[in-house]
Amino acid sequence: FGPLVPMLSFKSFDEVIERANDNDLGLCSYVCTNSMETANLASEQLETGSVAVNTGVVAIAEAPFGGIKQSGYGREGGSMAIKDYLNVKYTHMGIKG
């Protein structure tokens, strides 16, 4: 068993984004490019919880990790993760003593 990399041909950047987003899953995406502009556009347009550019590493302890769509619930890791375990309550007291 090992990692698999599907290789698909495409004619335009828009086609890549459309094909990548056309599914019910959204855990993470991987982008290989030499263009910072392409990397930024892909990161903005891909419907995933995280995007790795030119690396296979997408999760680190300091960053939130989790998917969107049918890939998981909420975020793990980072400061955002604690919000899933909190129940915020507001209490206003008009006590005169």
Give a label for each model feature.
Residues 1-97:
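Conserved C-terminal structural/oligomerization subdomain of aldehyde/semialdehyde dehydrogenase
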